[in-house]
């Protein structure tokens, strides 16, 4: 299946409103308004998810997947502009799995559901903070399903937050310790084994690199939550060494928040450049 850039650039125009296409039967029984768009809420395997319907779906049904924090900083992310371009916007909550094998299995069913709806085989992912962990884990497990990744202050180290140094916000250390216990339980290892776990994104760059999945990452130099030196700096170095593709937007004076950009158009442009039109 092929897209052409002109088709997506026309999404939302009168030309699109007159084009006939098969109706999509969305999952779930609840439809709500979300930033002026129609959002279809559903449950899968007892977990909540949603699909936001673009006013005029583009040919081939391209889609954008927010891995985590789907309600955070939405206008600063690519989500709304991509909806106007005809992309569907989707989310599936697997946060408490930290994308262990159970989480991957849920997302595999989610992906099959999207394919049954006729969506394009590859989506583009947004991974903010913990969403980076989910995005990179999914892309490593199923690189054939990912066209590109926009990452933002991403978690790349399963053992993140365990370091005790001046860069880590003191008020977050207790929370990090509790989170580490949960992550260790999810992966069935000891806390001290999290950083060296073979599925930690820092240690599992090769599938993403070999698939040449393009990544655009916002790095925040003053981040005291997800320390760049233990996360994206390690990940990007190893990814490049493995032949991967990553572009870093370095914001040396920014902290962990806010995610996204005042004008998210550069993020949209990155996605449109790398979606398989």
Language-model regions, residue ranges each:
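Short amphipathic alpha-helix adjacent to the substrate-entry channel of hydrolases
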Residues: 73-90
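C-terminal catalytic histidine-bearing segment of alpha/beta-hydrolase fold enzymes
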Residues: 225, 230-277
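The feature captures the conserved acid-bearing segment of alpha/beta-hydrolase catalytic domains
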Residues: 170-233, 237-240
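Hydrolase active-site cap/lid region
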Residues: 137-191
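Alpha/beta-hydrolase fold nucleophile elbow
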Residues: 118-129
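Glycine-rich nucleophile elbow surrounding the catalytic serine of serine-hydrolase chemistry
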Residues: 127-137
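N-terminal cap/lid segment of alpha/beta-hydrolase-fold proteins
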Residues: 5-59
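Alpha/beta-hydrolase active-site loop
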Residues: 98-118, 137
């Amino acid at each position: 299946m092929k897209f052409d850039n002109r088709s997506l650039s026309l999404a939302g125009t009168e030309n699109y409103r007159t084009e006939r296409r098969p109706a999509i039967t969305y999952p779930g029984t609840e439809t709500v308004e979300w930033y002026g768009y129609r959002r279809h809420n559903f449950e899968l395997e007892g977990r909540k998810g949603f699909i936001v319907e673009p006013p005029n779906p583009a040919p081939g049904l391209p889609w954008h997947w927010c891995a985590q924090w789907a309600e955070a900083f939405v206008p600063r992310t690519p989500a709304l502009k991509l909806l106007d371009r005809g992309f569907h916007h989707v989310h599936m909550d697997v946060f408490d799995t930290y994308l262990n094998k159970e989480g991957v299995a849920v997302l595999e069913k989610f992906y099959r559901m999207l394919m049954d709806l006729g969506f394009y085989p590859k989506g583009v992912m947004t991974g903010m903070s913990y969403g980076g962990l989910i995005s990179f884990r999914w892309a490593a497990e199923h690189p054939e399903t990912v066209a590109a990744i926009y990452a933002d202050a991403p978690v790349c180290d399963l053992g993140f937050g365990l370091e005790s140094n001046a860069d880590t916000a003191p008020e977050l250390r207790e929370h990090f310790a509790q989170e580490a216990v949960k992550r260790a339980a999810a992966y069935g290892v000891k806390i001290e084994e999290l950083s060296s776990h073979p599925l930690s994104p820092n240690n599992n760059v090769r599938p993403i690199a070999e698939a040449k999945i393009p990544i655009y990452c916002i790095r925040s130099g003053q981040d005291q939550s997800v320390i760049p030196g233990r996360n994206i700096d390690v990940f990007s170095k190893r990814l490049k060494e493995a032949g991967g593709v990553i572009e870093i937007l370095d914001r040396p004076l920014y902290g962990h928040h806010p995610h996204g950009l005042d004008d998210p158009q550069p993020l949209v442009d990155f996605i449109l450049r790398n979606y398989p039109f």
